[in-house]
Amino acid sequence: MASSNLLVLLLFALFAIPRGLANYDKPPVYQPPVYKPPVEKPPVYKPPVEKPPVYKPPVEKPPVYKPPVEKPPVYKPPVEKPPVYKPPVEKPPVYKPPVEKPPVYKPPVEKPPVYKPPVEKPPVYKPPVEKPPVYKPPVEKPPVYKPPVEKPPVYKPPVEKPPVYKPPVEKPPVYKPPVEKPPVYKPPVEKPPVYKPPVEKPPVYKPPVEKPPVYKPPVEKPPVYKPPVEKPPIYKPPVEKPPVYKPPVEKPPVYKPPVEKPPIYKPPVEKPPVYKPPVEKPPVYKPPVEKPPVYKPPVEKPPVYKPPVEKPPVYKPPVYKPPVYKPPVEKPPVYKPPVYKPPVEKPPVYKPPVYKPPVEKPPVYGPPHHP
């Protein structure tokens, strides 16, 4: 005990003496305790713990005693079955060959033609395939001589083929009067093949609908006249025609069937009222009829758990109904004389013996009986 007390005193002296030897010239500055207000932590929201309903085993109600209803025995007179006639002849198992039924002819059911509404496919726009211009050398193919009398060059009768309609605003249709314009006489000697560069003139896209088919009567077309004398065609320098501006073909609007999109459910976002100044723009008045009612999803209230009221099982004492005693009506048994049905002598159905080849099923031979 003494040694332990000394050790405690020494340890106390080691910690207390340095603090006791304080500097009296500079007394320690008293620092009042700083008041720290308690940090008010917001209450942590703990969602209500939805306690699962306590499983209470179903109260086992005692079985209601139902006294057995004593039904009087129903009198069933004994059915006197006539003796079944069993012929003593042991009929061998009748082999019924597989009846090959002919295929039952089922007349083709004439289904009425299912009406399929014509699918209105929008006209598929096929961009004009830029085919490179097929260069035909002028020597091999001389210019086709078209006699001016029989068939004027590019004679477009006003009835058979109307002039190509070009929008009058952008470019009026070039009207070539068939009467006033004489056939351009191109001497066959100095006429070179007119080379139309494919770059300067884009391929003319003529929609098949707007342009009626050019009717070329086969009778009026004279045979191609090939002059025997190969006269050199007159060389005309290529006139640099400005690129013919053809207005963009107004493509018919591609009919896209209205895709029946399901109504996009937008949850009612509680938007703040949009402030629209009355001077710049008055608030758009939307009649209440056109505006659908703002769908507010029903607040899913947790189901109020009402513990099942444990009603004590109503004990209904078994009503003892005395069995209704019905005295047995002594009905005399209806005597039915035994109806004698003579045994119907059915002639044995003759079935031709089916030949069974030994390959399919060899005959079963029993052991030889030795007397």
Swiss-Prot record:
GO terms for cellular component: extracellular region. Expressed in hypocotyls, roots and mature root nodules. One of its GO terms (molecular function) is structural constituent of cell wall. Residues 1-22 form the signal peptide. Its main location: secreted. Sequence repeats lie at residues 32-36, 37-41, 42-46, 47-51, 52-56, 57-61, 62-66, 67-71, 72-76, 77-81, 82-86, 87-91, 92-96, 97-101, 102-106, 107-111, 112-116, 117-121, 122-126, 127-131, 132-136, 137-141, 142-146, 147-151, 152-156, 157-161, 162-166, 167-171, 172-176, 177-181, 182-186, 187-191, 192-196, 197-201, 202-206, 207-211, 212-216, 217-221, 222-226, 227-231, 232-236, 237-241, 242-246, 247-251, 252-256, 257-261, 262-266, 267-271, 272-276, 277-281, 282-286, 287-291, 292-296, 297-301, 302-306, 307-311, 312-316, 317-321, 322-326, 327-331, 332-336, 337-341, 342-346, 347-351, 352-356, 357-361, 362-366. Keywords: Cell wall, Developmental protein, Repeat, Secreted, Signal. Residues 49-317, 339-371 are annotated as: Disordered. It is found in: Secreted, Cell wall. Residues 32-366 are annotated as: 67 X 5 AA approximate tandem repeats of P-P-[IV]-[EY]-K. PANTHER family: PROLINE-RICH EXTENSIN-LIKE PROTEIN EPR1, REPETITIVE PROLINE-RICH CELL WALL PROTEIN 3. This is a developmentally regulated putative cell wall protein. Belongs to the plant proline-rich protein superfamily. ENOD12 family. This is Repetitive proline-rich cell wall protein 2.
